[in-house]
């Protein structure tokens, strides 16, 4: 049976292990934050699709003691991800109870979402599912971001990327697509970024 090339450790996964992050995806967020100044040290940040927790850990390390993170995922966070400034809700992002609980801890300075659908290998199906997650993440952002806030969401290329980007431009003063260096060259994922939420 052929090996899954994604299971082979690469530069980024080795770096994540050495720096005590649960996954290599952290370096995508790090690059985007350095380039676009997504966060300030005392921010309240909502992390959707947070498991295993690399983005959560990165944000917690970036924030000061006044900062807070609310994280949501169907799966549990890695056992190493714990902090008094973290509130984690394990459940479906579509669930009304989850939406209510998240809203009670807001509003937020940034909404970030690295969620990906369960893939089928059918690009049409996978991009459609990814598009649904983008719509949900943008709903959270529109409902719970403070004016001037930031937004980042993963999207699979080849679907409704331009439609979503146009929707972001209605809500944010700046909106663009960006593919971090830490994305695998064979991956068709990229990120949509919204800056300075109009409110």
Swiss-Prot record:
Report the top EC class in one word.
Answer: transferase
Per UniProt, subcellular location reads as: Cytoplasm
Q: Which Pfam families match?
A: FtsJ
What name does this protein carry? Answer: Ribosomal RNA large subunit methyltransferase E
Q: Which reaction does it catalyse?
A: uridine(2552) in 23S rRNA + S-adenosyl-L-methionine = 2'-O-methyluridine(2552) in 23S rRNA + S-adenosyl-L-homocysteine + H(+)
Q: Which HAMAP family match?
A: RNA_methyltr_E (MF_01547)
- Record: active site: 154 (proton acceptor)
Annotated source species: Treponema denticola (strain ATCC 35405 / DSM 14222 / CIP 103919 / JCM 8153 / KCTC 15104)
- This protein's UniProt keywords: Cytoplasm, Methyltransferase, rRNA processing, S-adenosyl-L-methionine, Transferase
Q: Which family does it belong to?
A: Belongs to the class I-like SAM-binding methyltransferase superfamily. RNA methyltransferase RlmE family.
Q: Which GO terms describe its molecular function?
A: rRNA (uridine-2'-O-)-methyltransferase activity
Give the binding site residues for S-adenosyl-L-methionine. 53, 55, 73, 92, 114
Q: What is its main location?
A: cytoplasm
**UniProt function note:** Specifically methylates the uridine in position 2552 of 23S rRNA at the 2'-O position of the ribose in the fully assembled 50S ribosomal subunit.
Query: Which PANTHER family does its entry note?
Result: RIBOSOMAL RNA METHYLTRANSFERASE, RRNA METHYLTRANSFERASE 2, MITOCHONDRIAL
| InterPro entries to which the protein is assigned, alphabetical | RNA_methyltr_RlmE, RNA_MeTrfase_FtsJ_dom, rRNA-MeTfrase_E, SAM-dependent_MTases_sf
Reading the lineage from the top rank, the first entry is Bacteria
Q: What does UniProt give as GO cellular component? A: cytoplasm
EC numbers on record: 2.1.1.166
């Amino acid at each position: 049976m052929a090996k899954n090339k994604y299971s082979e450790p690469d530069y980024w996964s080795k770096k994540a292990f050495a720096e005590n992050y649960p996954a290599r995806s952290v370096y995508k967020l790090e690059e985007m934050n350095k380039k676009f100044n997504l966060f300030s040290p005392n921010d309240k940040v909502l992390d959707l699709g947070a498991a295993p927790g690399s983005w959560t850990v990165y944000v917690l390390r970036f924030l000061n003691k006044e900062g807070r993170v609310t994280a949501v995922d169907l799966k549990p966070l890695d056992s190493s991800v714990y902090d008094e400034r973290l509130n984690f809700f394990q459940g479906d992002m579509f669930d009304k109870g989850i939406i209510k609980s998240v809203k009670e801890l807001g509003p937020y300075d940034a909404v970030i979402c690295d969620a990906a659908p369960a893939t089928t290998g059918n690009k049409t199906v996978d991009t459609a599912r990814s598009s649904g997650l983008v719509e949900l993440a943008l709903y959270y952002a529109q409902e719970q971001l403070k004016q001037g806030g930031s937004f980042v969401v993963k999207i699979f290329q080849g679907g409704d990327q331009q439609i979503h980007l146009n929707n972001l431009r209605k809500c944010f003063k700046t909106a663009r697509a960006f593919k971090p260096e830490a994305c695998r060259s064979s991956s068709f994922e990229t990120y949509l970024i919204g800056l300075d939420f109009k409110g």
